[in-house]
């Protein structure tokens, strides 16, 4: 459990998200800056389209959906090989975004 949790948390930190570490669940919320994506649904769609990793918008987990509009939920109850692949794909989110930003500026 802890190995998988830390693997995902480290990956999320590498791509600029702030993970909230669970004490016992296999789900992890992670916050993102609103200048990166306009909201949780947009972030979910972007990550799925870019790298094929499914997340759930944080809005689904709050009584007031706007309280979770800067968060995504990730599941790490996966086989280790699947989690390793998902983390590798997630690390591409950061690189692809950086490449697009550089090409836009140039």
Where are these regions (language model features)?
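PLP-dependent class I/II
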Residues: 1-106
């Amino acid at each position: 459990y802890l190995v998988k949790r830390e693997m995902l948390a480290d990956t999320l930190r590498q791509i600029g998200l702030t993970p909230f570490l669970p004490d016992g669940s296999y789900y992890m919320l992670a916050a993102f800056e609103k200048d990166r994506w306009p909201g949780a649904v947009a972030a979910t769609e972007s990550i799925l389209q870019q790298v094929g990793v499914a997340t759930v918008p944080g809005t689904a987990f709050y009584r007031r959906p706007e309280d979770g509009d800067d968060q995504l939920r990730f599941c790490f109850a996966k086989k280790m090989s699947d989690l390793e692949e998902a983390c590798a794909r997630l690390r591409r989110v950061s690189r692809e975004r950086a490449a697009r930003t550089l090409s836009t500026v140039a």
